[in-house]
């Protein structure tokens, strides 16, 4: 498997043996802390007995039934639970196997909404630069990453506006002013494209793999909502990373007044890493409008998969009953406080940011100037190697060829205790101290 991304059959990662809670063990017996919940998916931790029992029980009855032939009781129950957690206006769920598929299906549904409304000319989707929405060709075109260019030859180019930043701000602008510039870009672009042709605007309320837990000021989300309403554009929130409670609310949109989307997309934490599961959520009024015009008939072998939905129901039930959303908020605040303390003793931690248990640390050459380290140093790869040796599994990126900085995610499972947080921060501190010494030596 590793040969697909390394191009060689050399030494690969360690072989996994088992996992429980926030810990993973390899075949040699070495223990790791899952600092980023895999790729920010393992919300309730590994080896949860309730989830394993739900998996066994459902597998013993039926693993697969195609939705055209049978309705799965657990898909109905999961949809109802999601509607209750997501709140008014996101009443119905369409289940698929992964985030990229959910984004694709959500956009297809949005197109059906336009047709049901008698607006066949609406087809354009505006997204942000940077952003990350998946790994299919359509979702890559939304994501605006130059690394994807070789895969997109012949594909219609995406329509992008700038995403707002909180750390790497344009010269002379504060976060509020920069956010206002970005919302003005949205208005200008809708007008330039022709409002009657614009179908949707898609954004990540908290950036995941494109910007390391960056979010905008509250005013940004409210103004985006107002602009979309003004021009009849559907607002889609990609909550694949931030949703299912990770940000300290079920949807990150709930952190800000007036920010509610028309459509929302969930994955990762929805299945908790136990099964491939994703969904988009839609208002009953839009679902009924589409149904009245013939329905949303899109074939997908594993949509509303009975086993996946049974496991997803157990994951969300565990999340609710053990108050893991509230725990994400409280433990996440403690985590950021500890990371900021670490920042105070470091010359290379430029920024600590995030919401709930979705956080990032940006690494810089110099904290005062915010100067980035040279690409040749591969600072993220070096931190990951140091962390792995210490027993920490960390995800990080150098975004858009370094244009938006080097950062590592600190997003452990929502079940992490303060003792777990202390161990993570202590280990990370050692890694960054080692890196500081290496940088000082190299000049």
Can you describe what each PLM-predicted range is?
Residues 1-443:
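Conserved N-terminal phosphate-binding loop of PLP-dependent enzymes in the Aspartate aminotransferase
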């Amino acid at each position: 498997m590793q040969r697909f991304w390394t191009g060689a059959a050399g030494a690969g990662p360690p072989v996994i043996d088992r996992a429980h809670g926030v810990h993973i063990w390899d075949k040699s017996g070495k223990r790791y802390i899952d600092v980023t919940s895999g790729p920010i998916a393992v919300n309730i931790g590994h080896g949860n007995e309730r989830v394993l029992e739900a998996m066994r029980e459902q597998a013993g009855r039926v693993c697969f039934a195609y939705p055209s032939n049978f309705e799965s009781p657990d898909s109905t129950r999961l949809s109802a639970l999601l509607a209750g957690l997501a709140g008014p206006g996101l009443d119905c769920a369409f289940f698929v196997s992964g985030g990229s598929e959910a984004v694709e299906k959500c956009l297809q549904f949005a197109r059906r909404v336009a047709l049901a409304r008698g607006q066949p000319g609406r087809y354009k989707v505006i997204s942000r630069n940077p952003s990350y929405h998946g790994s299919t060709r359509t979702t890559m075109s939304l994501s605006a990453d130059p690394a994807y260019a070789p895969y997109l030859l012949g594909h219609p180019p995406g329509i992008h506006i700038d995403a707002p930043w909180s750390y790497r701000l344009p010269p002379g602008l504060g976060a509020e002013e920069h956010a206002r510039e970005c919302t003005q870009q949205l208005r200008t672009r809708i007008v330039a494209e022709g409002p009657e042709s614009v179908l949707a605007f898609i954004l990540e309320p908290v950036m995941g793999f494109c910007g390391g837990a960056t979010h905008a000021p509250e005013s940004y989300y409210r103004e985006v909502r107002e602009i979309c309403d003004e021009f009849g554009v559907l607002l889609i929130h990609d909550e694949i990373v931030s949703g299912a409670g990770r940000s300290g609310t079920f949807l990150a949109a709930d952190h800000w007044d007036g920010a509610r989307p028309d459509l929302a997309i969930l994955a990762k934490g929805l299945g908790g890493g136990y099964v491939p599961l994703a969904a988009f959520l839609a208002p009953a009024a839009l679902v009924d409008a589409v149904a009245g015009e013939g329905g949303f008939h899109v074939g997908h072998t594993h949509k509303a998969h009975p086993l996946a939905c049974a496991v997803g129901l157990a994951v969300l039930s565990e999340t609710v009953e053990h108050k893991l959303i509230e725990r994400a908020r409280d433990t996440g605040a403690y985590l950021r406080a500890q990371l900021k303390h670490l920042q105070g003793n470091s010359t290379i931690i430029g920024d600590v940011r995030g919401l709930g248990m979705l956080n990032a640390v940006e690494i810089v050459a110099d904290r005062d100037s915010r100067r980035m380290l040279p690409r040749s140093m591969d600072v993220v790869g070096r931190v990951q190697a140091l962390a792995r040796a210490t027993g920490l599994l960390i995800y990080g990126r150098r975004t858009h060829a370094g244009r938006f900085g080097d950062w590592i995610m600190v997003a452990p499972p929502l079940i992490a205790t303060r003792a777990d947080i202390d161990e993570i921060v202590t280990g990370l501190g050692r890694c960054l101290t080692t890196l500081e010494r290496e940088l000082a030596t190299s000049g």
